[in-house]
């Protein structure tokens, strides 16, 4: 287990050392939330208000909160998948740089090497998507907060599941090409 943790730590350090990869993975959720809030929010709000009969009145705060929740849900779904692919580039770079050859002659099983890649992808993705989660909560708070603590915890749990799914998917696809 110590070997897996050492490989995980190595991959985490490489991810944070590569400023381009770090910047790209962190800026992606920020760009998406700005684009969603700028362009899609009005479209979503118009479609919500058009679907509500005239005899029913719903407060703007509730409609804005619902629209913000829809936008942040789609942002988190996209971000949790795309960020994991960006984070998992360490595995691809190791193959391109020849570092994998060094790992192959080391007295470490392939399972431990792949587990180290996978766990570091999960940890790094959770950090980046955690930042996106906080930004989304801030956007929800600004637009119309309606969630309680249990709702926030369920959304956090959903984010963790999405990161695990994205990490598994990106690891499988990276293994196919290695």
Q: For the regions a protein language model found, what residue spans apply to each?
A:
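Short, membrane-interfacial amphipathic segments enriched in basic
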Residues: 1-8, 166
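Alpha-helical transmembrane segments and their short interhelical loops
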Residues: 110, 118-177
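Perimembrane loop-to-helix junctions flanking transmembrane segments
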Residues: 48-63
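Short hydrophobic alpha-helical segments within the ABC transporter permease transmembrane module
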Residues: 27, 100, 113-122
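Transmembrane helix boundary and interhelical loop/hinge segments in multi-pass membrane proteins
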Residues: 84-108
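Alpha-helical transmembrane segments of integral membrane proteins
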Residues: 2-5, 20-24, 69-73, 150-158
């Amino acid at each position: 287990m110590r070997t897996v943790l050492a490989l995980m730590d190595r991959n985490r350090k490489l991810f944070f050392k590569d400023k381009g990869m770090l910047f790209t993975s962190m800026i992606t959720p920020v760009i998406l939330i700005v684009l969603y809030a700028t362009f899609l929010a009005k479209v979503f709000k118009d479609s919500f208000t058009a679907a509500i009969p005239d005899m029913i009145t719903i407060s703007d705060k509730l409609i804005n909160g619902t629209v913000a929740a829809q936008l942040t849900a789609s942002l988190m779904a996209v971000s949790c998948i795309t960020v994991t692919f960006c984070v998992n580039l360490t595995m691809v770079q190791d193959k391109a740089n020849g570092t994998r050859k060094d790992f192959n002659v080391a007295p470490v099983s392939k399972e431990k090497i792949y587990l180290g890649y996978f766990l570091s992808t999960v940890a790094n993705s959770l950090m980046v998507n955690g930042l996106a989660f906080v930004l989304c909560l801030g956007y929800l708070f600004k637009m119309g907060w309606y969630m309680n603590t249990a709702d926030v915890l369920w959304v956090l749990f959903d984010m963790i599941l999405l990161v695990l799914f994205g990490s598994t998917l990106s690891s499988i696809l990276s293994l196919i090409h290695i």
